[in-house]
UniProtKB/Swiss-Prot annotation:
<dbReference type="GO" id="GO:0007031">
    <property type="term" value="P:peroxisome organization"/>
</dbReference>
<protein>
    <recommendedName>
        <fullName>Peroxisome assembly protein 22</fullName>
    </recommendedName>
</protein>
<keyword id="KW-0576">Peroxisome</keyword>
<dbReference type="Pfam" id="PF12827">
    <property type="entry name" value="Peroxin-22"/>
</dbReference>
<dbReference type="InterPro" id="IPR024359">
    <property type="entry name" value="Peroxin-22"/>
</dbReference>
<keyword id="KW-0472">Membrane</keyword>
<keyword id="KW-0962">Peroxisome biogenesis</keyword>
<feature type="transmembrane region" description="Helical">
    <location>
        <begin position="13"/>
        <end position="35"/>
    </location>
</feature>
<keyword id="KW-1133">Transmembrane helix</keyword>
<keyword id="KW-0812">Transmembrane</keyword>
<comment type="function">
    <text>Involved in peroxisome biogenesis.</text>
</comment>
<comment type="similarity">
    <text>Belongs to the peroxin-22 family.</text>
</comment>
<dbReference type="GO" id="GO:0005778">
    <property type="term" value="C:peroxisomal membrane"/>
</dbReference>
<dbReference type="InterPro" id="IPR038613">
    <property type="entry name" value="Peroxin-22_C_sf"/>
</dbReference>
Amino acid sequence: MVSKASRDQLRKYGAVSLASLLVAASIVAYRWWNAAPSIEVEKKLRRSVSRCVVVTQGIQNEDMIHDLLFEDTVMLLAPGCTAEGRLKSASRENAYKVISCTTWQSVWACVRHFRKHTLLVRTSEVPSGVPADIGGYVSDISDI
């Protein structure tokens, strides 16, 4: 038989061993999870910027447009742009993000309404240029 003092000492060693094991496992798990961002985190970081893209005739056939449709992006089809059917069929679940505008005034009205972080537009294809007040509705205007 084991004496009471020996049992108490075994319990203490067991408790200390268990605590040490838990601390070591916690440290390993913490370092493993924080070593590199996961794919989901990278996607969230990439998506964190909302965009509004004015699709004109010159850029309607570029692959970049199709890739942006899956992110937090609204596609505004400028007057004369014929890519509506192709963009909507590329991703039926994101078809609601493709908006066809009949006038340039309606394009700028949509940009003002959506207030996205970034506006992507090919300024050389905009007949009267980007209106001066658009900078108050978006944080960044990028010429593509």
